[in-house]
Swiss-Prot record:
Gene name of the encoded protein: purA
Compartment(s) where it occurs, according to its Swiss-Prot or TrEMBL record: Cytoplasm
Cofactor: how and how many bound: Binds 1 Mg(2+) ion per subunit.
Entry EC no(s): 6.3.4.4
Protein name, per record: Adenylosuccinate synthetase
Catalytic activities: IMP + L-aspartate + GTP = N(6)-(1,2-dicarboxyethyl)-AMP + GDP + phosphate + 2 H(+)
GO cellular component, one term: cytoplasm
Binding site for IMP: 13-16, 38-41, 130, 144, 224, 239, 303
SMART domains with a match to the protein in the record: Adenylsucc_synt (SM00788)
Organism: Bradyrhizobium sp. (strain ORS 278)
Length: 430
């Protein structure tokens, strides 16, 4: 029996929510281990649409325990809002089926304000974030001045922790000519919200260790994608956390032995939100056609996603940096009807062919994709639930992707619906 990690193998938005929801039927516990409420999922279940940003997808299934790990940055108001909306849709969410790491870092209003300031300034600091305070909160975490969930339970030490936090932020704000923040106001806000949050607080590493020893199946749910990893992604156009599979252990308080199988998610094409290099981007009618068919708009932000052809080089790189055992290929149906489909198999950089994506920002901007043209298919793949339902040419496309990225396809998704999934290899039984 393998504990399974699900990670994005592109720039996020690969359809992790649906796949995690589909796999969660076999899991006992679903764990979020990094990121914040900047990465959204849209799930369609029995015709009902659910939008998640911070909560694990396990909350959509009864009888499952969902956990937010210590690697996440946690916005109290966003959490309460999301819980409230899902409860209004009839879901039962309580401390009985949702636990939050007591040592999770909190996102405060000052983090959101700083994030927005950087994105709107003309100083060259904008990189296309969601302005939700994710990066500034992680900065405070590694700077050892963050407020954590457990701090709300100790009102004797909380004022001192707020003062320590503001010693940094007010110095920064003073230099930027901004109004200074009153620590008493932060204290009032946190004191007011504490009774609503603390019932969810848990020593997560201990809880998960106990459950593992009891033989419970764990499903780790990543946010964003490997190409947004702060170390291995398209730096500086990345998120502020490690998004690769190894972070599942760190972000949940478990050792690497807790990971048994890594499932990577990728679309049958490529999308990206925000700024940064995108070698196969199609800023043309093809890109617009893919975007319209795939409804490529951010779940949280509504921003249109940039669209392009499948990049086998980048996905192959993600397979290596994440230790991916199998891929779940999503949105194959969006390519239905194309006469031909392009797949990037390599790059040219300054006249030379290379087989990997360079780390340097300048080199990333100069790479040119080398394409292989593949014949398309006319028959629909939408709603297919077995290989027999797929056109022969679509199967050839899937097999060619396997060859190019050096990794087998374990799952194939053909619509947003939970059941429109073709299983090749069950990750929990691998």
């Amino acid at each position: 029996m393998a504990n399974v990690v699900v990670v994005g193998a592109q720039w996020g938005d690969e359809g992790k929510g649906k796949i995690v929801d589909w796999l969660s039927e076999q899991a006992d516990i679903v764990v979020r281990f990094q990121g914040g409420h900047n990465a959204g999922h849209t799930l369609v279940i029995n015709g009902a649409t659910y939008k998640l940003a911070l909560l694990p997808s396990g909350v959509l299934r009864s009888g499952k325990l969902s956990v937010i790990g210590n690697g996440v940055v946690f916005d109290p108001q966003a959490f309460l809002d999301e819980v409230g909306k899902l409860q209004a849709q009839g879901l039962i969410i309580s401390p009985d089926n949702l636990r939050v790491a007591e040592n999770v870092t909190l996102i405060l209003p000052l983090h959101r304000e700083l994030d927005a300031l950087r994105e709107s300034s003309n100083t060259g600091t904008a990189i296309g974030t969601t302005r939700r305070g994710i990066g500034p909160a992680y900065e405070d975490k590694v700077g050892r001045r963050a407020i954590r969930l457990m701090d709300l339970a100790d009102l004797d030490t909380l004022p001192h922790k707020i003062d320590r936090l503001l010693a940094h932020h007010n110095a920064l704000r003073r230099g930027l000519g901004l109004e200074l923040i009153d620590g008493a106001e932060i204290l009032r806000e946190l004191t007011a919200v504490a009774p609503k949050l603390l019932p969810y607080a848990e020593t997560v590493w201990r809880l998960l260790d106990i459950k593992r020893r009891e033989g419970k199946r764990l499903l780790f749910e990543g946010a964003q994608g490997a190409l947004l990893d702060v170390d291995h992604g398209t730096y500086p156009y990345v998120t502020s956390s490690n998004t690769v599979a190894a972070q599942a252990a760190t972000g949940a308080g478990l050792g690497p032995g807790a990971i048994g199988y890594v499932l990577g998610l990728c679309k049958a094409y490529t999308t990206r939100v925000g700024q940064g290099p995108f070698p196969t981007e199609q800023d043309n009618e093809t890109g617009r056609k893919i975007g319209e068919r795939g409804r490529e708009f951010g779940t949280n932000t509504g921003r249109p996603r940039r669209c392009g052809w499948f990049d086998a080089v980048l996905v192959r790189q993600a397979v290596r940096t994440c230790g991916i055992n199998g891929l779940a290929l999503t949105k194959l149906d969006i390519l239905d009807g194309f006469d031909t489909i392009e797949v990037c198999t390599g790059y040219r950089l300054d006249g030379k062919e290379i087989d990997h994506f360079p780390a340097g920002e300048g080199a990333q901007a100069r790479v040119e994709p080398i394409y292989e043209t593949i014949e398309g298919w006319k028959q629909p793949t939408a709603n297919a639930r077995s290989w027999a339902d797929l056109p022969a040419q679509a199967i050839k496309y899937v097999r060619r992707i396997e060859e190019l990225v050096g990794c087998p396809i374990a799952l194939l998704s053909t619509s947003p619906e939970r059941e429109d999934t073709i299983l090749v290899q069950n990750p929990f039984e691998a």
